[in-house]
């Protein structure tokens, strides 16, 4: 399967693992009764900005050398992130009546995730479309799909990373550039449909592997030391209860 920088092994894997962990851990105390909205959007924007810039190294570095392919990977990473942030904000405005800073940051991350498997295989046009699609689908992932799954996925690991990784991995088989593929010496399936099916198989295998292995690992940890802190520690916050410090 085509996966340039880890759309399957990093994002689908971690997103599915997060969902399994959320089910096994259970919901946070007070969820649904207390406001749990992000309380420091300044840190959110700073963090998203650092991730955005760092992703250039993540995707560009997967070319394993400074050259045309690395440059294109960095360019399409920027394009996809911007396109996804835009489409996310548009959908958010339509659905909720207003766009938000948090939405813009989430949309950018969605675009970064979506382009990860495709960064070394697509051009600017393909990256733009993938970003636009990814922003919309990931918004659905953290809203309607999240409600359907009924999991307390606090950081939207599944809705952003797993869903975004799935979208990116499948669309890589749709929007790859023949010119870039040939220049890189990548061997594809004999037909377009065949390559697309390989992408779907890769996604499915990653989901199954991650879900099973995560369940086994967490089950063992739960039997040995447990995977959830006490209710008092949870309310106090893990920074303070586990480490004796807190950043206000």
Predicted regions and their residues:
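Glycine- and aromatic-enriched membrane alpha-helices
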Residues: 1-248
């Amino acid at each position: 399967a085509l996966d340039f920088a880890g759309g399957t092994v990093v994002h689908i894997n971690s997103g599915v693992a997060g969902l399994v962990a959320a089910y096994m851990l259970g919901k946070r105390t007070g969820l649904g009764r207390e406001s749990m909205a992000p309380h420091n959007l300044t840190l959110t924007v700073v963090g998203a900005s650092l991730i955005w810039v760092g992703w250039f190294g993540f995707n560009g570095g997967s070319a394993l050398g400074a050259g045309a392919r690395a440059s294109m990977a960095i360019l399409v990473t920027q394009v996809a992130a911007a396109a996804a942030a835009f489409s996310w904000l548009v959908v958010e405005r339509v659905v909720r009546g207003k766009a938000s800073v948090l939405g813009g940051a989430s949309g950018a991350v969605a675009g970064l995730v979506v382009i990860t498997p495709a960064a070394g295989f697509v051009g600017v046009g393909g990256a733009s479309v993938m970003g636009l699609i990814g922003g919309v689908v990931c918004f659905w992932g953290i809203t309607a799909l999240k409600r359907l799954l009924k999991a307390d996925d606090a950081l939207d690991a599944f809705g952003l990373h797993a869903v975004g990784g799935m979208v990116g991995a499948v669309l890589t088989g749709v929007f790859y550039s023949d010119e870039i593929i040939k220049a890189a010496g990548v061997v594809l399936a004999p037909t377009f449909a065949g390559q697309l099916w390989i992408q779907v198989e890769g996604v499915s295998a990653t989901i199954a592997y991650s879900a099973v292995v995560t369940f086994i690992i967490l089950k063992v940890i739960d039997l040995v030391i447990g995977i959830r802190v006490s209710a008092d520690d949870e309310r106090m916050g893990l920074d303070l209860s586990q480490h004796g410090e807190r950043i206000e």
